[in-house]
């Protein structure tokens, strides 16, 4: 299956969805647990499918897993712009690396943009995607990329070994990273490969890009774009998706 023919640099969403999400509880990986009547992953995918800025959406699932369209029939997982690749690894790093290779196989180019997004951030909206894409592409032809993020608002405490407060950490200049994280395909592949060679643990794509000597752009995200991690997070996510909680696109911490 080939990619679309948008003039210039194309944009691909890459959603690693091979994780187990054990902290969220439940019998299924959290991205497949029901949220507002549909699998959490469905809400995440729909934000990208509803975005005119995205050429194709690629979901990375576990090797041998049932196809999403068969597992969740009638929910649009067979959409023309959606591709599922069952090449997930044993870590996010591995799943993203394998997903980028799969994009190459689909015909994506070195300079095409890739927006990597957590499957467990179902509060993403097309407006937030457009904000990130617009800000990164306005950064110039040599833009290295950028991420959605929020300035830290809470007071931060560093704990000692006994879980007592050791110190207060100044929050000035600190941001809480979100996703999507948007980078050129080739640059991101090289950065992740270098991190693996150096046995460097990277918790997101921006960490690898930073370690390679680049400075990604910080673009204001939104509170609704939080990561579902613990059992109590499901109720909050459902409230946001139902419109029962503040959902202003520009809301910040």
Swiss-Prot record:
Keywords assigned: Isoprene biosynthesis, Nucleotidyltransferase, Transferase
Enzyme class, UniProt record, top EC level: transferase
InterPro entries: IspD, IspD/TarI, IspD/TarI_cytidylyltransf_bact, ISPD_synthase_CS, Nucleotide-diphossugar_trans
GO biological processes: isopentenyl diphosphate biosynthetic process, methylerythritol 4-phosphate pathway
Keyword Protein biosynthesis applies: no
Site residues by UniProt (Transition state stabilizer): 23, 30
CDD domains: CDP-ME_synthetase
Residues with site note (Positions MEP for the nucleophilic attack): 171, 227
Pathway: Isoprenoid biosynthesis; isopentenyl diphosphate biosynthesis via DXP pathway; isopentenyl diphosphate from 1-deoxy-D-xylulose 5-phosphate: step 2/6
Gene Ontology MF term list: 2-C-methyl-D-erythritol 4-phosphate cytidylyltransferase activity
A Pfam family hit: IspD
Family statement drawn from the similarity comment of this UniProt entry: Belongs to the IspD/TarI cytidylyltransferase family. IspD subfamily.
Protein name per Swiss-Prot or TrEMBL: 2-C-methyl-D-erythritol 4-phosphate cytidylyltransferase
Organism: Ralstonia nicotianae (strain ATCC BAA-1114 / GMI1000) (Ralstonia solanacearum)
